[in-house]
Amino acid sequence: MDQNELKKLVGEEAVKFIEDGMTVGLGTGSTVKFMVDALGERVKNENLNIVGVPTSDRTAEQARSLGINVKSVDEVDHIDLTIDGADEISSDFQGIKGGGAAHLFEKIVATNSKKVMWIVDESKMVDHLGAFPLPLEVIPYGSKQVFKKLEKEGLHPEFRKNDAGEYVLTDSKNYVIDLHLGEIKHPHQLADYLIKQVGIVEQGLFLDMVNTVIVGRQNGPEVLTARP
């Protein structure tokens, strides 16, 4: 199976955990897209009654097009389960997210959820975090000063730009700075440092957060329990 087939596999496996009446956080990214497609099929074929809480404009648009009832995080009083992708997951189930520039909204939804599930193909499972650049969402005002400070700290920052050389904007119209770290030895310390920096709205380390991980492997989906 190629990578897309593995992503489709875990997306279809994940929706088996969604029950009638649930409020479900809908993540963002290529793997989640397959999951939302599969959820749309269940809504259509089984008349499944659920509320989806999307973490990006593009996920909201996809969900609505499939007939999924969509509400914002501020319109619901609870979220039973959030299903999202990840860019890296370490052996102790810590994660990096934000490759799709949605990590602020993703973290807001995840931290307000009873349970969090990540769905990934096997290439995302690593021993240590850091090979994937760590995304930061920063407000445009003063962003070059933030950049200079990160550079001075030896964190190898880079503004994320599109093919036209323009700054990539988040749904909140903020910039993204990626840190090219190679390996993150002390993720909790790094997260604490970054979030204290004025101008950084959120950072892409998702720590002590996930309950279940579904990994797409060549021999089928593997369901791992990270935390009760």
Swiss-Prot record:
* Described purpose of this protein according to its UniProt entry: Catalyzes the reversible conversion of ribose-5-phosphate to ribulose 5-phosphate.
Give GO terms: molecular function aspect only. ribose-5-phosphate isomerase activity
Q: In which pathway does it act?
A: Carbohydrate degradation; pentose phosphate pathway; D-ribose 5-phosphate from D-ribulose 5-phosphate (non-oxidative stage): step 1/1
User: Gene3D superfamilies per the record?
Assistant: 3.30.70.260, 3.40.50.1360
Q: Which GO biological-process labels does this protein carry?
A: D-ribose metabolic process; pentose-phosphate shunt, non-oxidative branch
What is the official name of this protein in its record?
A: Ribose-5-phosphate isomerase A
Q: What does the entry list under GO cellular component?
A: cytosol
Keyword list, A-Z:
Isomerase
Quote the subunit structure annotation: Homodimer.
This protein's record includes keyword S-adenosyl-L-methionine: no
Write the Enzyme Commission number(s) for this entry. Answer: 5.3.1.6
Catalytic residues, chain numbering: E106 (proton acceptor)
Kindly report, in one word, the top-level EC class recorded for this enzyme: isomerase
Family the UniProt entry places it in: Belongs to the ribose 5-phosphate isomerase family.
Taxonomic path: Bacteria, Bacillati, Bacillota, Bacilli, Lactobacillales
Q: Which PANTHER family match?
A: RIBOSE-5-PHOSPHATE ISOMERASE (PTHR11934:SF0)
Residues folding into a coiled coil are none
Question: Catalysed reaction per UniProt?
Answer: aldehydo-D-ribose 5-phosphate = D-ribulose 5-phosphate
Record-annotated residues binding substrate? T28, G29, S30, T31, D84, G85, A86, D87, K97, G98, G99, G100, K124
